[in-house]
């Protein structure tokens, strides 16, 4: 085969011709040694040129579905999996539902007049004609769309990816063999032709049969229109997974189908009521055979003299009353009693709709039939249809509505199981209350949605984008990470997991191994230390949104040769309020530190020291100890100066009294030198407050 585009285009070339090498459209022959022999026959050369031009102008017949975008402007054929077809299917589904609602309204065209005749409502006739004609346009457009919609070749599905057939003739032949005639019948304007062409040509007694003709044509076309909804819904479900996007829309859709069935049943009951009323008139007419004709029940003849004379002399109005007992109206007695057949359109429509809905819901239990077989069959259909449709409605409504409350019910069941387990294990009331509080807060925060399970079902690229959107600003808010490159931040974000804490929960206690770093989203934590339980030592701080804790793990992870044993916490961290955070476990932090060597940068030393609570505590204690040492040394120096001054004055006085002034000067010098030596030996033994042990210095050097 010859290929213009090896991936997206396919031509049905002659295999033998495609194997012959050509140069500028001329066949090329070669000697045994490889030298070229030009073609001698100009006639054959022209023949080959013509053949090659023909091959280049061949119509594109097939294309792989993923390559359709490249050739769609050239072939003018629609992709059955494209967005345009999906959007049109939804529009056409709505148009089909509207048409199914409009067609039964033609049953309301016959109207019973007070003159005991049947007429056609002209205003309703015009309105229904316009609406029905507009709806028929969608069926015509659907036929045109199918003539221009490619299909997947069945033989190509074996190889895993289907090829779209783009040849117009093949598409048309396939459509003619599958579904065209059904679409054609559904698109025919049968009711319009019936009420504007056929019925006006009828005269006399044939007008009485208008109801039968109308009922036959409407039902004849209604069945294929109703059938078209099911494959159309299947196509939408196959393309998008669901017909409706939300559970409430799905429940409303099923309820609408149930109301549509009530609408159809009410319209049929109205038309059959008129037929039963006309049957009563005919029964009276048979009794008055010499003066009555069936043509008198046509409102076109109410001004005829024989008809006027018959109406004056006849007792048809009294005999055909439901209370007269002359004729068994059966299930249609309500229409006669309420005068539905002669009421304005909206009055009779809503009454008939209510009749259909009431009997469908009650499975026809309130229907009191006569002995007419046709009437009994109608009652059987109502009961059977009501049973099936009501069961479908309840089932579908339950399915859609349960999708809303299923997580709530699961949470309630889980809460019940938790209560039973706590009772079985005889947990103390305080512990039970803490468990209840945590479960309640988890439900409020997540609504039963397991975020990690949702993310696991998504592709890696989408997971990365979602984590980046949720966590990037939070991670950047940590000063220790704000200067890292994007790849490093993405690696950290990918490994963050959501965490929840209720008020009073201890995240970690002093001396326990640190398993994770926490990045706070909302809420506050209390972090404090007693320096291993030392008397008189207490240091605390408040951690809020944007802060982090568990920095001991960072020192452990930054070590090129970290120990298997996790570091111990130097602080106790307790939830001051309900806290939502992201957690980075030890193994993930170790992986990030080992993969990205830029984390081992000396530029991070000062940031790590400044924002680490452990280093802050050590620095504060170190400064306090240094200040205390300085203060004590200063006080000791002042005290020694005073003591020296007093001792010197006393010694001078004693020497002066005993030996004179010369010995005073010499004694003073000896005393000063002696005290100076004593001070030099005793100055280093002054009391010093031992400082807090210095934290382990992280190794930022590259391996």
From Swiss-Prot:
GO terms for molecular function: transmembrane transporter binding; voltage-gated potassium channel activity. Residues 1-10 have a biased composition (Basic and acidic residues). Keywords: Ion channel, Ion transport, Ligand-gated ion channel, Membrane, Nucleus, Transmembrane, Transmembrane helix, Transport. It comes from the Eukaryota. This is Protein CNGC15c. It is a multi-pass membrane protein. GO terms for cellular component: nuclear membrane. Residues 616-644 form the IQ domain. Cyclic nucleotide-gated channel involved in the establishment of both rhizobial and mycorrhizal associations. Required for full activation of nuclear-localized Ca(2+) oscillations by Nod and Myc factors. Simultaneous activation of the K(+)-permeable channel DMI1 and the Ca(2+) channel CNGC15 can give rise to sustained Ca(2+) oscillations. May function during fertilization in both female and male gametophytic Ca(2+) signaling. PANTHER family: CYCLIC NUCLEOTIDE-GATED ION CHANNEL 15-RELATED-RELATED, PROTEIN CNGC15C. It is found in: Nucleus membrane. The lineage of its organism: Eukaryota, Viridiplantae, Streptophyta, Embryophyta, Tracheophyta. PROSITE patterns: CNMP_BINDING_3, IQ. Residues 681-694 have a biased composition (Polar residues). Belongs to the cyclic nucleotide-gated cation channel (TC 1.A.1.5) family. A nucleoside 3',5'-cyclic phosphate binds at residues 480-565. SUPFAM superfamilies: cAMP-binding domain-like (SSF51206), Voltage-gated potassium channels (SSF81324). Residues 1-23, 676-703 are annotated as: Disordered. The chain crosses the membrane at residues 91-111, 179-199, 216-236, 255-275, 372-392.
């Amino acid at each position: 085969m010859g290929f213009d585009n090896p991936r997206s285009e396919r031509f049905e070339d002659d295999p033998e011709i495609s194997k012959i090498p050509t140069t500028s459209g001329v066949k090329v022959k070669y000697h045994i040694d490889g030298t070229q022999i030009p073609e001698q026959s100009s006639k054959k050369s022209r023949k080959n040129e013509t053949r090659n031009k023909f091959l280049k102008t061949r119509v594109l017949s097939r294309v792989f579905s993923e390559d359709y975008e490249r050739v769609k402007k050239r072939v003018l054929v629609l992709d059955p999996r494209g967005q345009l077809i999906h959007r049109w299917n939804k529009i056409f589904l709505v148009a089909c539902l509207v048409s199914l609602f409009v067609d039964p309204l033609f049953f309301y065209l016959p109207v019973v007049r007070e003159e005991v005749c049947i007429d056609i409502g002209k205003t309703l006739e015009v309105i229904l004609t316009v609406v029905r004609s507009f709806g028929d346009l969608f069926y015509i457009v659907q036929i045109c769309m199918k003539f221009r919609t490619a299909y997947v070749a069945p033989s190509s599905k074996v190889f895993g990816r289907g090829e779209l057939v783009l040849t117009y003739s093949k598409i048309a032949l396939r459509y003619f063999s599958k579904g065209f005639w059904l679409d054609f019948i559904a698109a025919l304007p049968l009711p319009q032709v019936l009420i504007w062409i056929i019925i006006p040509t009828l005269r006399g007694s044939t007008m009485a049969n208008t109801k039968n003709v109308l009922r036959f044509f409407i039902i004849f076309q209604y069945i294929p229109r109703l059938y078209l909804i099911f494959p159309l819904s299947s196509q939408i479900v196959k393309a998008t997974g669901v017909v409706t996007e939300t559970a409430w829309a799905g429940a409303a859709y099923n309820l609408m189908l149930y109301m549509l069935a009530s609408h159809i049943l009410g319209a049929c009951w109205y038309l059959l009521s008129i037929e039963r009323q006309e049957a009563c008139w005919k029964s009276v007419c048979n009794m008055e055979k010499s003066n009555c004709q069936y043509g008198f029940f046509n409102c076109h003849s109410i001004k005829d003299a024989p008809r006027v004379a018959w109406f004056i002399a006849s007792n048809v109005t009294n005999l055909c009353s439901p209370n007269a007992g002359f004729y068994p109206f059966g299930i249609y007695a309500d229409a006669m009693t309420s005068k539905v057949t002669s009421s304005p359109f909206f009055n009779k429509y809503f009454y008939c709709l209510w009749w259909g809905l009431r009997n469908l819901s009650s499975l026809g239990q309130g229907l009191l039939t006569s002995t007419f077989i046709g009437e009994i069959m109608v009652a059987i259909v109502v009961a059977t249809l009501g049973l099936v449709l009501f069961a479908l409605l309840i089932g579908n409504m339950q399915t859609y509505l349960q999708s809303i409350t299923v997580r709530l019910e699961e949470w309630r069941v889980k809460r019940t199981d938790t209560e039973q387990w706590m009772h079985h294990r005889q947990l103390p009331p305080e512990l039970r209350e803490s468990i209840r509080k945590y479960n309640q807060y988890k439900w409020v925060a997540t609504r039963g949605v397991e975020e990690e399970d949702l993310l696991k079902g998504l592709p890696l690229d989408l997971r990365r984008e979602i984590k980046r959107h949720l966590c990037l600003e939070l991670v950047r808010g940590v000063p220790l990470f704000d200067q890292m490159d994007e790849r490093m931040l993405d690696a950290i974000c990918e490994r963050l997991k959501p965490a929840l804490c209720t008020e009073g929960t201890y995240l970690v206690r002093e001396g326990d191994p640190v398993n994770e770093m926490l990045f706070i989203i909302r809420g506050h934590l209390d972090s404090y230390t007693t320096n291993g339980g030392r008397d008189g030592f207490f240091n605390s701080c408040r951690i809020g949104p944007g802060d982090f804790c568990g920095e001991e793990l960072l020192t452990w992870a930054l070590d090129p040769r970290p120990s298997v044993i996790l570091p111990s916490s130097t602080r106790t961290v307790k939830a001051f309020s309900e806290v939502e955070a992201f957690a980075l476990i030890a193994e993930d932090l170790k992986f990030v530190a080992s993969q990205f060597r830029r984390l081992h940068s000396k530029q991070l030393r000062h940031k790590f020291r400044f924002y680490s609570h452990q280093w802050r505590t050590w620095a504060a204690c170190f400064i306090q100890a240094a200040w205390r040492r300085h203060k004590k040394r200063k006080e000791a120096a002042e005290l020694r100066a005073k003591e020296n001054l007093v001792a010197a004055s006393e010694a001078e006085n004693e020497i002066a009294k005993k030996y004179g002034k010369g010995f005073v000067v010499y004694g003073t010098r000896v005393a000063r030198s002696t005290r100076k030596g004593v001070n030099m030996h005793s100055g280093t033994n002054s009391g010093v407050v031992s400082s807090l042990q210095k934290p382990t210095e992280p190794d930022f050097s590259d391996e």
